[in-house]
Amino acid sequence: MLRICVKRPCIKIVLSQVRPALLVRKENLHISTGVKVEKSSIINQKDPNKVRVEINELKRQAEIEKAAIKELEKNPQYQKLAEAFNSHDHVHLRESETEQNDIISLGTIRDYKSSKCEQADKPSSLNLHSHTHSHGHTHSHAAHNPLLVLSTEQIRKNAGVRITWVGLGVNVGIAIGKFFGGIVFHSQALFADAIHAISDMVSDLLTLLSVGLAANKPTADYPYGYGKIETVGSLAVSTILAMAGISIGWSSLCALVGPVIPHTIIDTIGNLGHAHTYSEDIIEDVTDINAAWIAAASIAAKEWIFRATRKIAINTNSNVLMANAWHHRVDSLTSLVALVAISTGYLVNIQSLDTIGGLIVSGLIIKAGGEGMCIAIKELIDQSVSRDDPRYLEIETLVKDTLNKLISNNNSQKPYGLKELTLLSSGPNLRGHLTLEVPLQKWGNILGVNEFEIVTHHLRNVLTNEVSNLRRLDIEYVEEKNGEENEHIKGQQNYKEDVLIKHDHTNTHI
């Protein structure tokens, strides 16, 4: 509600809700025509003539009020206020009446005097209490994050969990197919890939666990939420991915250098590797070309699940889903290596292509796993989001726009300034810390604690509505330093530096 008061002759109005029409008070309404509308008296029901007169008088007053409203709506100043009120992006606060209000000056405690008794003596029309206006709806232009769900039923329905369950089912089918295919078609490459598919199921289970727990609500014990659980899951999945790459590379390297290294050393090194061992003995066991169909089907399934998981990971800003997506891509590449090994071994009997392909694939695997591990570790130790990150730029722009449109008790003719913005990642969620610079006021105007509370509440509402994964926002206020104060501080610093230089110079000569 906004109350506008001007020195008499004046029009006192009340704006309730956002609409062009106004509710004009019946008590002491003064308009430019000099007509004064008094509060209607109690209708005397005993005298029909008086009742009729009172009804006619009320009708006449209503017509006068409607005419006054129409006249006011034509006023350019009113239209400007109504347009600002309809913008949804402002806050109306109490206008300072004196320096001796019940408030605390920012940065120092000065002129702090209680004025509750003075406020009690003032008429209610002058007690313009601070408030924000709230509409029955909010506007959110950011994409909804399906991982930010609240109930167990919603967790089961969100896209991240669904695609992980699909990936788990695909891994089970691939593991069974490759296991029996390796036995039936005498393919050691398929059999080794089946063992790797089993490790993928462990990765999927870790992803399901971390995504489900990270979606829980913050509690008193965990006020920042459970987003870090997803980060830990991302670290575990990325570690498994990197270890698989090292294992494949190690086995391929052993197979590649086998002809120039004694057989006993190769056997010892090969036993240290993963089940992905593409040595000469394995290639010699590939005798049935039909095993290639299983490898080709695995490539198609894994590539599809990679693209689907990666798309959802980007939409939900989920590192653990992204790590799991790359795990699917690695599986398709290892299946490609198996396909090449089966085909070349059967058709042209070129064994070296398999080992070289294994080294290339292992390099891609280690790169993807290492990057995922680095991102997870940086997030766990609370590295801030970089300033060129799209998430940072979006929130920074939103804060500045909101501050520029803010109508408050600030009379410096320039808005609050954004001095510092810090964003921290917590799984799919974000935590923010704002430092706002309050400009110097004119005419001894003192900003109250109540104003800062309302500005804080307004900023939080705007940002959490526009950025769905912003779970917590802390706001700090600092006072702007004037030019003389800055020059004085700078002069003191220069003086101290000169003294230190002279002192060092004297000690050197001594």
Curated annotation (Swiss-Prot):
One of its GO terms (molecular function) is monoatomic cation transmembrane transporter activity. Gene3D superfamilies: Cation efflux protein transmembrane domain. Residues 130-141 have a biased composition (Basic residues). The chain crosses the membrane at residues 165-185, 194-214, 241-261, 286-306, 333-353, 356-376. It holds the Pfam family Cation_efflux. Coiled coil: none annotated. It is found in: Mitochondrion membrane. InterPro entries: Cation_efflux, Cation_efflux_TMD_sf, CDF_Transporter. One of its GO terms (biological process) is iron ion transport. Residues 120-141 are annotated as: Disordered. GO terms for cellular component: membrane; mitochondrial membrane; mitochondrion. It is a multi-pass membrane protein. Keywords: Ion transport, Iron, Iron storage, Iron transport, Membrane, Mitochondrion, Transit peptide, Transmembrane, Transmembrane helix, Transport. Belongs to the cation diffusion facilitator (CDF) transporter (TC 2.A.4) family. SLC30A subfamily. Mitochondrial metal transporter involved in mitochondrial iron accumulation. PANTHER family: MITOCHONDRIAL METAL TRANSPORTER 1-RELATED. Present with 6490 molecules/cell in log phase SD medium. This is Mitochondrial metal transporter 1. It comes from Saccharomyces cerevisiae (strain ATCC 204508 / S288c) (Baker's yeast).
